Amino acid sequence: MRSSLELLIRRVVPAVMMMGISGTVTAKDHLLTIGGGYSPTGNQASLEANVIFYQQLVSQSYSTPVEHLIYFADGTDPKDDLQVMAAESNTESPAIELLEGIFSADGPQVTYRNHEIPNITDKIRPAAIQTGLEQIASHVVGGDRLIIYVTAHGGSAKGDDPMDTSITCWGKQPISMRQFTEWLDEIPSDVSVVMVMAQCYCGGFANTMFSGGDPKNGMSKGNRVGFFAQRHDLPAAGCRPDITNDDEYSSYFWGAFLGQSRTGKPVGIVDNDQNNRVSFSEAHAYAVVASPTVDIPLRTSDVYLRAHSRIAGHREGAAASPSAENSGKDVELGLSSLSGSLSNLAVQASLDQRVMINGLLTQLKLPFDIEVAEILNQKEIQEERFRQARREAGRRGSSRRESRSSGRRDLQQQIIQNWPELQEADDWDDLESLTGRRGEGFLDELRDLPAFETYWTSKVERSRAQEKSVYAELKAVQFRRLVHTIESVVFAKNLPVIASPEILKRYTEMLTLESSFFGS
């Protein structure tokens, strides 16, 4: 059984999409991409790879050329601005490989080059991006869409508004959510805006749905929705010099349309309603389930629900309070709570929400008929496991005290004392003592050094503690995603009970836009 709201959306979306092929009005998409870092050291190769991957999707999704303004890092400046992984050592000597691990600095070894993104509009700077939005606003027509993709760095809120997070531009110039919203307010109200954002703290930009980015001003005149990698109060995953790792939200989101991730990992079933097209909301559902990151992705409609609906006995939501008075009102109104069997609650969920719930339950090895209260209980247990694992990893981490007790520095000194010729790493490949059978003998002698056992034991223990912490965090994140989805189901179920017709109408319009398709 589908909710009445979902059935309405399923009827409205095809009608809206047909407007572009009816022969009277052909709506166009206009794309604006903001990518890259704030300096060469903050401009990781994964950001470049994300933009190139998106360009590939655009070229395959539109039958005719589409306007696409791209702002990336330092723009067309030929200087090296991109941080990439240094070439790995190709040594075949186990002795040299071990020495490299002992003497090299922790973390990836990097180098720099100029970015290779074609068709750049300008560098990532506030004035240029504002000009680009003004340019688009000057020639769009009613029914067009503006699609904005951000794969950059972001900053947390600095003032009193926790949602006023920012995009960090070249030279560390910020674009705050409220400033960005003021620019969007200049877009004609009959032009819809779809945002896909993957920067840290990007969830704050969900408030672009309000005029000026401020809930006190009411909703914006135009319909705006967004899909965000992370909440407004947490950093996001994904910025790294290693492009072989594409575990970040937008790679999975855009990969849902192409059938593979940025690195070629195949995508499973995404077309949940089997209409032979992938919608934005279906891509989001896939990313929520498939991306193994610390992110808790959300969309604008999730934030809208929390602004206008509430859950019985729940602190979050419109006019929410744990007071006995409000609890009594909630019961009187018949508002649903976070209780009962999940299988019964899921009947009220949209198709995409059910996909997320089923996928996350499978990952957590939980039954579909589990009680919601038990999910909340297990979530708290996993959160505590993560806190303990993180504390343990911190104790064995990179603090000065731990560095002194790891034995690494002592081992380095003992190696140089016994083999002074090893002081220059560039000479290692030329030393016969490190290759062949002589290399095997060197390894035996190195392992007999007094500091080696301390170094190796500490290295193994740190690695195990870190792996345990990462595993515990990912499990906690899966619970957070599941609970977030369940809450959204209940918020949506309660919305018609307490909201005005205008609020319901706007929510329906949001869902319609979120369920639209990418491309022509």
Where are these regions (language model features)?
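Bacterial N-terminal signal peptides that target proteins for export
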Residues: R2-V13
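Boundary/activation segment at the start of structured domains
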Residues: V25-G143, L333-S520
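Second-shell loop/turn segments in exported
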Residues: G36-A45, N114-K123, E134-I136, T165-G171, ...
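Solvent-exposed loop/turn segments at secondary-structure junctions
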Residues: G37-T41, D74-K79, A152-K158, K172-P174, ...
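Acidic, glycine-anchored loop motifs typical of Ca2+
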Residues: L47, D161-M163, P266-F280, V303-L305, ...
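Active-site-proximal C-terminal subdomain of hydrolase catalytic domains
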Residues: I52, V194-V303
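A short, glycine/acidic-enriched catalytic loop
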Residues: Q109-I124, H139-V141, H153-I187
